[in-house]
Regions:
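A short, small-residue-rich loop immediately preceding and capping a beta-strand
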Residues: 58-95, 168-181, 280, 284-286, ...
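Active-site-proximal loop->helix
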Residues: 65, 74-131, 208-223, 246-250, ...
Length: 351
């Protein structure tokens, strides 16, 4: 086992795993499991990339407070990076995102400022901008910062190219949050693997890319207002209520071969099936990407190779509908197993 100088050196180099039970016959279906990053999501890459770029440029000063708007995963990644490097961190987050996320960030030393659920991502971004300007804090601007896709071009994309060197890679399937993974990896695949088709998934409730309606922007690239095609959806971390500038770059580059819309119920079904049939424990957005990959498989020629990105672990979804039907108490079947032998039974609960 390798030795590392600090936790940040362990970011990246996540495994590509073949799907054995859920893959359609005749298709080689793989997933890249970003939960293997130290804080459990693909956003660990972004967090390190934007902080190191700001240090190099001089934008971020020693001891300066860092601030970002986040649905959770970027904030968790930033909390790890800031703890390791010695920067205070404040995150703004809509109150609708899972409680686990805010607790994880606070456990890592960050301060979490909640914004009204009705104001969605637009509200938490506006609050972060306001706080940064008022207090002189460094705003990482994950939705516009070029260090985000650059990090994915240097790491995620290189890993994919290396893992499939000399082999077929017919389809690469991803979702989008900031668009960093989509745009960064697409830049490299278009140059080095032009044969690979790039497929992007988005929520059926928020078909912003599918609508072909342009996002209204301020001069600095930030959204001027929410996108008209957005409606709330259960895929936390996917598709904020605007099209990020970084995502729009991939659209403008015309690197996307296909856009799929995914229903929330299908995303959660795939998350559960990955856990129970493949032993792969991921969140709702990963289930959404996997649902998209299965859709691609339906029309892919025999022998095709499909790779889907799985952005995060499932543990930060315990309080969400993904776990809504998972009981804390023993089920009837579990009680029957318990009662099949005479000892060490729990006492019946009072009525």
């Amino acid at each position: 086992m390798a030795k590392f100088a600090n936790i940040l050196e362990t970011i990246g180099r996540t495994p590509v795993v073949k799907i054995t039970k859920l893959a359609p016959k005749g298709i080689n279906l793989y997933v890249k499991i970003e939960a293997f990053n130290p804080l459990g999501s693909v956003k660990d890459r972004l967090a390190l990339g934007v902080i190191e770029a700001a240090e190099k440029s001089g934008e971020l000063k020693p001891g300066q407070t860092v601030i970002e708007a986040t649905s959770g995963n970027t904030g968790i990644g930033l909390a790890m990076v800031c703890a390791a490097k010695g920067y205070p961190l404040v995150v703004t987050m809509a109150e609708s995102f899972s409680v686990e996320r805010r607790k994880l960030m606070r456990f890592l030393g960050a301060k979490v400022v909640l914004t009204p659920a009705a104001e969605r991502a637009f509200g938490m971004v506006n609050k972060a901008q306001e706080l940064a300007k008022t207090h002189g804090w460094f705003l990482t601007r994950q939705f516009e910062n070029e260090a985000n896709p650059d990090m994915h071009a240097r790491t995620t994309a290189r890993e994919i190219v290396d893992d499939f060197k000399g082999e077929r890679l017919d389809y690469w399937v991803t979702g989008f949050g900031t668009g960093g993974t989509l745009t960064g990896v697409s830049r490299v695949l278009r140059k080095e693997r032009p044969d690979t088709k790039i497929v992007v998934c988005e929520p059926a409730d928020a078909p912003m890319l599918s609508s072909h309606i342009a996002q209204e922007r301020n001069p600095d690239g930030t959204p001027a207002k929410p996108h008209p095609s957005f409606k709330p959806h259960p895929m936390q971390g996917w598709s904020p209520d605007f099209i990020p500038k970084i995502t729009a770059e991939a659209v403008d580059m015309k690197v996307i071969d296909r856009i799929l819309t995914i229903a929330g119920a299908d995303a959660m079904k795939c998350s559960r099936e990955l856990a129970q049939k493949e032993g792969i424990f991921v969140g709702i957005s990963a289930g959404g990407t996997f649902a998209g990959a299965l859709e691609v498989c339906k029309t892919a020629p025999a022998g095709s190779t499909v790779l889907a990105m799985l952005p995060d672990t499932g543990e930060r979804y315990l309080s969400t509908p993904l776990f809504g039907d998972i009981p804390a108490d023993m089920t009837e079947d579990e009680l029957k197993i318990s009662h099949s032998t005479p000892s060490n039974r729990l006492a019946p609960k009072a009525a």
